[in-house]
Design a protein with these regions (language model features):
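Bacterial N-terminal signal peptides
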Residues: 13-24
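Scaffold/interface architecture of coatomer-like assemblies
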Residues: 27-383
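N-terminal secretory signal peptides that target proteins for export/translocation
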Residues: 1-9
Length: 383
């Protein structure tokens, strides 16, 4: 009996020793992946690249004859569109009929306060001339802040009341931040697809065209506007004109308005002189391409002009004979007499700048003047 007990104890001791040895081996085993052998390359897991493709490109096309009158007699077969030199198939064609989604950006800085009464009267022009019967609009005010004053609505009364009650704020002007907000708002509106028409996305900016203190840069805004098929129009407000319209004030020591440029002796202080001085007469097309390629850098050139050229719109000055009302009326007339062409790019994921060219291939097209958006920039994939 004692022998059996001693045998059982030895068996238990042996079992405990085996369990202890197994635990020690497990404790020494690596918990992570095995290190690579010397000279053997490590295979990395594939990166999740975020690829951006352009599903549909839409460009406004304005066609005028030699007298400057709009041409309304063209069909889709009369146009040729190329993207980086490759001919594209037009999938959607329209002449002024697609409904408009409009963002109205209005400068409300104290610098243009003398022009405020004129601006407050423009509401009916936006609703009757620009929006049209099927349009919708939103209103954004900008000074040193960006304020959404009215979300998208088709109510003419709401738009007109919002503009009639604009309040003047500080002297700041965050133009680029306001434009970025406008592009974001328009991106939410349905646009055309290959199966059905959509809304034309239009931004109309009433401003001096200067920027002070924005977090965004113009190139960043324009890149997004191009990819979202947003067309930008500008109505340039003149601080010189505002000063001339201001009520006389008691004599004070000379104090130049913020942003003005003193001309040399004998040169009148016109906006043309100030623009040339401030922006160096930059080539607009070169400025557009440079801007969308260098989105974190400042852009030379009048921002409203550069934005209009980049997106197929137009920028109208109001310094001389053209009033603010006339400028808005001209833009409305153009929008409803303008062609809209859409296509799906044959190489939708080719990165870099895509140059768009639109031409009229009719025999009598020699003297026609065509304006369309010049292109868009597709950034490389993000990892």
């Amino acid at each position: 009996m004692n022998g059996m007990k001693r045998g059982g104890c030895r068996a238990i001791e042996l079992l405990l020793m085996l369990l202890f040895a197994a635990g020690a081996l497990l404790a020494q085993a690596p918990t992570g992946p095995l290190p690579p052998k010397p000279g053997v390359p490590v295979q990395q897991p594939p990166k999740n690249e975020i690829k951006v493709q352009v599903a549909l490109v839409t460009t406004p096309v304005t066609v005028r004859d030699s007298h400057g009158d709009m041409v309304h007699s063209l069909d889709a077969k009369d146009f040729r569109v190329t993207d980086n030199g490759a001919a594209q198939k037009i999938s959607h064609f329209d002449l002024g009929g697609d409904p408009i989604s409009l963002v109205i950006l209005v400068e409300t800085s104290s610098r243009i306060e003398p022009l405020a009464p004129e601006i407050r009267k423009t509401g009916i022009l936006f609703t009757q001339t620009v929006m049209g019967p099927t349009g919708e609009a939103a209103v954004v005010g900008l000074n040193d802040s960006v304020d959404k004053l009215q979300d998208f609505t088709s109510s003419a009364d709401q738009i007109e009341n919002t503009i009639a009650n604009l309040r003047i704020g500080s002297s700041g002007l965050k133009l680029f931040d306001a434009m970025a907000v406008g592009v974001e708002m328009l991106t939410s509106r349905p646009q055309a697809t290959t199966e059905k028409p959509g809304r034309r996305r239009v931004m109309l900016v009433l401003s001096e065209g200067m920027d002070e203190g924005s977090e965004k840069q113009l190139g960043e805004v324009l890149r997004q506007a191009q990819l979202a098929n947003v067309t930008i129009y500008g109505v340039g407000l003149s601080t010189t004109r505002a000063e001339l319209q201001a009520k006389p004030k008691p004599p004070q020591p000379p104090n130049l308005p913020v942003g003005s440029v003193p001309p040399p002796p004998g040169v009148p202080a016109t906006p043309t002189y100030e623009d040339n001085y401030r922006y160096g007469g930059a080539d607009l097309m070169a400025a557009v391409i440079w801007a969308v390629q260098h989105i974190h850098d400042k852009v030379k050139g009048n921002p409203l002009e550069v934005a209009a050229v980049a997106t197929g719109g137009a920028q109208l000055s109001t310094f001389k004979d053209r009033s603010i009302e006339n400028a808005i009326d001209e833009i409305g007339g153009e929008l409803h007499s303008q062609y809209t062409l859409s296509y799906t790019p044959t190489e939708p994921d080719t990165t870099g700048y895509h140059e768009i060219k639109v031409s009229v291939i009719r025999n009598d097209a020699k003297n026609l003047k065509i304006r369309a958006r010049p292109g868009y920039y597709l950034a490389p994939p993000e990892s």
